[in-house]
Amino acid sequence: GIYLGVLLAFIWYLVPGRNRVFLAYPGRGGVVLAGAAVLAGVVDFALAYAGSALAGGNEVRFVISLLAGWGGWILYAGCATALRWGWTDERKVPSGHFAGSLVLLMVPGLAFVSPAPWGARVLSYGMMAGAVVLYAALNYLPLALLLHGRRTRPLIKAAIAAALVALALIEIRWGYGVYAAVRRALT
């Protein structure tokens, strides 16, 4: 229910005619972004499933992985709400969640394609570190913009900051599970 609810809420923000305050993309841009949101949701679901499988298939870990995948979209929808109701002066909040998910989806597989064990370690760990940095920068940058908005209300800033901390803890826990699984596979 949460999965579908967030997806529908996000699409609602992006349908033509409702997105001018959100991303300043008129007309067909809303349709394109809605399609990207759906595709990103599928990628996030696959990413969460793969992460839970690597971590042992535990249902609790799967839920944690799913929350980590959808956390960015949930916060992003919150940013859209802040923009819509005039709680911040930002007019454009970009998101790299889709690109970040694709990058992270490829990282665990890197450990199995390198021809040499030492090469696999360097490649997988190096790419994983780079992907995490890229993912964090692209996903948290929009929230940072809202935090620094001159008209952003203090209560909204506090809520965003708390959500950032919670999301970071969830994603660190998920990332460590994937890291441990890849390390076990390499050794």
Task: Annotate each predicted stretch with a short phrase.
Residues 3-187:
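Secretory/periplasmic and organellar redox-cofactor proteins
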